[in-house]
Amino acid sequence: MKNTTISSSLEDYLEAIAEIIEEQGHAHTKEIADHLKVKMPSVTNALQALSARGLIHYQSHSPVFLTPAGAETAA
C-alpha cells in the first residue's frame, strides 16, 4: 500500500484539483497554478508527489485525474 499521509500543502493541491475537475471536467497544470496562484514548477513537483502516493493520475501534458483514494482525501 502506498503512503497516503500528506502535508496540508499537498492537500490544498488535491482540493484545488477536485474543484477544477468539478467545474471543468478536467484539470491541467496551468489551471491548477492559476487556481492556487503559484508557479507551474511548484505544481509539477506537487503533482509528482501526489502521483507517487497514488492519489492522482499524472502524466506531463495531459489532464490530471484523481484516483479514488485522492478523491476521498480531497473530500
Task: Write out the residue ranges for each language-model feature.
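N-terminal helix-turn-helix DNA-binding core of bacterial DNA-binding proteins
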Residues: 2-38
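Short, hydrophobic-biased segments on the C-terminal half of alpha helices
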Residues: 47-48
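Basic, amphipathic "hinge/linker" alpha-helix immediately C-terminal to the N-terminal HTH DNA-binding motif
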Residues: 62-75
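Key DNA-contact positions within bacterial/archaeal DNA-binding proteins
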Residues: 41
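Residues marking the start of alpha-helices
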Residues: 1-2, 62
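A short, conserved structural fragment
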Residues: 51-61
